[in-house]
Amino acid sequence: MAGINQKNIRNFCIIAHIDHGKSTLADRIIEKTGLLTSREMQEQILDNMDLERERGITIKAQTVRTVYKASDGQEYIFNLIDTPGHVDFNYEVSRALAACDGAILVVDAAQGIEAQTLANVYLALDHDLDVFPVINKIDLPSAEPERVIEEIEDIIGIEAQDAPLISAKNGINIEEVLEQIVTKIPAPSGDASAPLSALIFDSLYDAYKGVIIFVRIKEGTVKKGTKIRMMATGAVEEVVEVGYFGAGRFIPCDELTAGMVGYITASIKNVRDTRVGDTVTDNDRPCEQPLPGYKKVNPMVYCGLYPADGAKYQDLRDALEKLQLNDAALQFEPETSIALGFGFRCGFLGLLHLEIIQERLEREYNLDLVTTAPGVIYKVHKTNGDVIDLTNPSNMPDPSEIDYMEEPMVSAEIMVTTEFVGPIMKLCQERRGIYNGMEYIEQTRALLKYDLPLNEIIYDFFDALKSRSRGYASFDYEMKGYERSKLVKLDILINKEEVDALSFIVFAGNAEERGRKMCEKLKEEIPRQQFEIPIQAAIGSKVIARETVKALRKDVLAKCYGGDISRKKKLLEKQKEGKKRMRQIGNVEIPQKAFMSVLKLDDE
């Protein structure tokens, strides 16, 4: 470890659109530099969460350090960070970029540039990184590397004539990529003797070691025994161990110096002491000012998370705090619901993010959860001039106090092949989209620009986009701001009682249809009882849709055989009377499936 020359360090990450082969290229780099033997290799070695392997996507940015002997005879240390491609995990990418000096842009030779490719490249250029392109999947019969090279130069404007043409899957031309990392990515700068300043770009919780923080050392040196201070929270700790990242494991070392990427443990037990984006400095000899951290990420989608068993409330709080360490974009605050008890209002970056967090809570922390329908943040302008941010429909003021409401809008860019332009434009119109123009990138592909309400895209816009374009469209969006809109709160009443967890805010023009669909869906999910259950959708006091779950009834006439009609009538009347009394005092259990099915309203 000692005596590493800073000139021989390369910190870089791999960026690309979903499924263009980032993680596979990372595998090949690890294999070619001899970090793991071919027996130890497995596909997507850096995707170490079960969830990532099952879905075949990268969720967490993962770091690994490997050594490469270049053609100039010198040994170089590579710190490689594999990043996610999904729009929901953009903040993971920006965190990884802050720890790097350069980036490899992977582009699929058959599909070319897609919306997410552009978004990630611009992120990298914002961080002043040197980006060099690599054309992957050249072994595919449909590969057109020449066309893709032209596209990269025309659309992104970076030199691509000498881009390596590789197949990460078959290991073709990987050597060329390794050589270009050495020549095209700059060595880190920074003075090892200056006061310590290090950027926390990730962290995780270990039951034995406490909080483990991942850092990029910008200036100075840190070793065991150093007293460190977190500049944002002011927490002071003594370093127990420093080290770097092997494949799937931590490797301790003596010290980390300027330019290196590694981890620090300091027996930090309080999860709130470390924040991603904070600067670590030496307590006795601090640096003058903190490093520019990250833009704070604002959640786009909110929903309630409740433990199915109310006694597990504290466990859910602990689990959320530990997940927040590892996932800086997750936000939560306590809330209560009449129907579901105590829980948390959580903020996410998108629906995929919500799903992943929910699955991680259920798997890693053995929790059983109930989720309410996701919604966005609305701005409510009241008649007295106050403006409130509304994340929970239950907190909506009385309609008489509301002057008007605004909803968040996004600017979306949709990249699509020309044959599907029609269906995609129709989809955007159905979702209240405002057309902003279209550019043809080449004869066969177009870039559509739309302003869309965030409310309309958080549910299943992505799925609808993929199905209407047979998987060819790609989509990227960014927040545009708030616009005035006619919104109403839709309440769901079950057995004449309002269920606050099922309420949601909807555009007035779609309210009736949504209400009707919701009632039909709930009718399928709620089990029949001894009495009939009315399910109603209402705006204020006006009921706009109704379905009824029929009662189960005993055949009271079974003993009557022939018998007199008035005797039968008497028995039926008596039964009817009993059912009526039951309905007044009966409680309806709403199964978890009913809450979930409401999220999938538009799938039919």
UniProtKB/Swiss-Prot annotation:
It catalyses: GTP + H2O = GDP + phosphate + H(+). Residues 7-189 form the tr-type G domain. GTP binds at residues 19-24, 136-139. Its EC number is 3.6.5.n1. It is found in: Cell membrane. Gene3D superfamilies: 3.30.70.240, Elongation factor 4, C-terminal domain, Elongation Factor G (Translational Gtpase), domain 3, P-loop containing nucleotide triphosphate hydrolases, Translation factors. GO terms for cellular component: plasma membrane. Pfam families: EFG_C, GTP_EFTU, GTP_EFTU_D2, LepA_C. It is a peripheral membrane protein. One of its GO terms (biological process) is positive regulation of translation. Keywords: Cell membrane, GTP-binding, Hydrolase, Membrane, Nucleotide-binding, Protein biosynthesis. One of its GO terms (molecular function) is translation elongation factor activity. Required for accurate and efficient protein synthesis under certain stress conditions. May act as a fidelity factor of the translation reaction, by catalyzing a one-codon backward translocation of tRNAs on improperly translocated ribosomes. Back-translocation proceeds from a post-translocation (POST) complex to a pre-translocation (PRE) complex, thus giving elongation factor G a second chance to translocate the tRNAs correctly. Binds to ribosomes in a GTP-dependent manner. Belongs to the TRAFAC class translation factor GTPase superfamily. Classic translation factor GTPase family. LepA subfamily. This is Elongation factor 4. The gene is lepA.
